[in-house]
From Swiss-Prot:
Pfam families: CLP_protease (PF00574). This is ATP-dependent Clp protease proteolytic subunit. Its EC number is 3.4.21.92. The active site is at residues 97, 122. One of its GO terms (biological process) is protein quality control for misfolded or incompletely synthesized proteins. Fourteen ClpP subunits assemble into 2 heptameric rings which stack back to back to give a disk-like structure with a central cavity, resembling the structure of eukaryotic proteasomes. It is found in: Cytoplasm. It comes from Carsonella ruddii (strain PV). Keywords: Cytoplasm, Hydrolase, Protease, Serine protease. The gene is clpP. Its main location: cytoplasm. Gene3D superfamilies: 2-enoyl-CoA Hydratase, Chain A, domain 1 (3.90.226.10). Cleaves peptides in various proteins in a process that requires ATP hydrolysis. Has a chymotrypsin-like activity. Plays a major role in the degradation of misfolded proteins.
Length: 194
């Protein structure tokens, strides 16, 4: 069981206790923590859509994730691109694989990481079993997904598709300065800026 701390929310109607995630959501802050899968994606997408329906002020998306299921991540990515609100992405800890794509998906100029964050990009991982024709179908789909992810990273980083394909051939780990140079983020959040 996960313990969620409660905080006091002060407003004109009086004080009330909120769990920490509800308080963060009220402040337009979402925390993506852990492996990206369908349940998490559904929660993140619904929070993004709710906040966007309230008003078009910026939404802050903190990311600490090893990545996960590509289709789940793409549902979050597509939602971010669809919103009227700008989404500021901030890596705290790690943004690997699909999480790195989401980090890059934030509004240009509003993508950050903390000094000790680690970012990793690579090609999608998958497996297939069954008849040879089924394995071939899945292999073609993996190549298609790789193309889509490389196009997304290219559009957000201004690196060529060729460069992205080359850089994602194997696990490619970057520190915050390398991530900034690569174009996945726009700035590093040092203590003096917080």
């Amino acid at each position: 069981m996960i313990f969620l701390p409660t905080v006091i929310d002060k407003n004109i109607k009086g004080d009330r206790f909120l769990d920490l995630y509800s308080k963060m959501l009220k402040e337009r802050v979402i925390y993506l923590n852990g492996a990206i899968e369908d349940t998490m994606a559904s929660l993140i997408v619904s929070q993004l859509m709710f906040l966007d329906s309230e008003n078009s002020k910026d939404i802050i998306l903190y990311i600490n994730s090893p990545g996960g299921v590509v289709s789940s991540g793409l549902s979050i990515y597509d939602t971010i691109q669809f919103l009227k609100s700008d989404v500021s992405t901030i890596c705290i800890g790690q943004a690997a694989s699909m999480a790195a794509v989401l980090l890059a998906a934030g509004k240009k100029g509003k993508r950050f990481c903390f000094p000790n964050s680690r970012i990793m990009i690579h090609q999608p991982l998958g497996y297939a079993q069954g008849q040879a024709s089924d394995v071939e179908i899945h292999a073609r789909e993996m190549i298609n997904i790789k193309q889509i992810l490389c196009e997304i990273l290219s559009s957000h980083t201004n690196n060529s598709i060729f460069q992205i394909f080359k850089d994602t051939d194997r696990d490619n780990f970057m520190n915050c300065k390398q991530t900034l140079k690569y174009g996945i983020i726009d700035n590093v959040l040092y203590k003096k800026w917080i």
